[in-house]
C-alpha cells in the first residue's frame, strides 16, 4: 500500500484554526492545540449565550415594566393581566421602551387598562411618535 502524504492538507487546516484564534492571548493564538481548544470553547460559549441573551433581555424588560408600573401603583402581574383581559397585543420590549422614554403614555395606558377602557394609540403623546428619542 502506498503512503498517503497529507502534510499540505494538515498545514492548511492548522493554519485556518490558528487564523480563527488570532486575537486570543498568549499561547492560545500561536500553538495549535491550545488554540483549537479555545476555538471550541469560544464557539460553545457563543452558541450558549445567544439563547441566554434572549432570556436576559426579557428579564430586563420585565424589570423595567415592573418598576414603571409600581411607580403608578400597579404590580407587573396585574398590569399584564389587564393587557390580556383587554386583548392588547403588545410585546414586553415595546412596553419597556414606552415605560422608559414616554412615561406619560405609559401612565395613560395603565389608567385606561385598569379602568377597563379600550386603548386607542392616538391618545398617546405626540412626542413618542415624532421620531425623537429622549434619553432618561
Curated annotation (Swiss-Prot):
Query: What are the UniProt keywords, alphabetically?
Result: Chloroplast, Plastid, Ribonucleoprotein, Ribosomal protein, RNA-binding, rRNA-binding
Q: What is its main location?
A: plastid
Record PROSITE patterns = RIBOSOMAL_L20 (PS00937)
Q: Could you give a GO molecular-function term held by this entry? A: structural constituent of ribosome
Alphabetized InterPro entries for the sequence? Ribosomal_bL20, RIBOSOMAL_L20_CS, Ribosomal_protein_bL20_C
Ranges in a coiled coil: none
Compartment list? Plastid, Chloroplast
Keyword rRNA-binding assigned: yes
Q: Please cite one Gene Ontology biological process associated with this protein.
A: ribosomal large subunit assembly
- SUPFAM superfamilies, per database record: Ribosomal protein L20 (SSF74731)
Q: Name one GO cellular component term.
A: chloroplast
Pfam families cross-referenced by the UniProt entry: Ribosomal_L20
Query: Carries keyword Ribonucleoprotein?
Result: yes
Describe its function: Binds directly to 23S ribosomal RNA and is necessary for the in vitro assembly process of the 50S ribosomal subunit. It is not involved in the protein synthesizing functions of that subunit.
In which family does this protein belong, per the annotation? Belongs to the bacterial ribosomal protein bL20 family.
Q: What is this protein called?
A: Large ribosomal subunit protein bL20c
Phylogenetic classification of the source organism: Eukaryota, Viridiplantae, Streptophyta, Embryophyta, Tracheophyta
Gene name of this polypeptide: rpl20
